[in-house]
């Protein structure tokens, strides 16, 4: 994992992310068993539910990051376009781990989405 850690982490965070945040996630990655990481990558690569997006009936919040090289914005747009009741929000100044890099904004957005669903119910 050490051999690929810097490349992977560079996809997870923007260059402006706090160093301690990046270093902590890099350490976590390096401690991950290589076979488990590879199996997870294979599973995600094989997972394709595009043909079922129209079946989603829940109000859906699709969150993307403008600088995400691991899951580019066009993937999020595809999901948002395919799910009938989807809304796409794009975080600037964030990469693949936008929920970590922009934790406060991410939590606020998700909390508002959930609150709105609860109020409607």
Per-region residue spans from a language model:
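Solvent-exposed polar/charged
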Residues: 54-55, 80-82
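Short beta-strand/loop motif that positions the catalytic acidic residue
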Residues: 56, 62-64, 68
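Catalytic active-site module of serine/aspartate enzymes centered on a nucleophile-bearing elbow/loop
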Residues: 85-121
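Conserved alpha/beta-hydrolase "acid-adjacent" motif
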Residues: 69-75
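Active-site acidic short loop of glycosyltransferases
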Residues: 57-58, 85
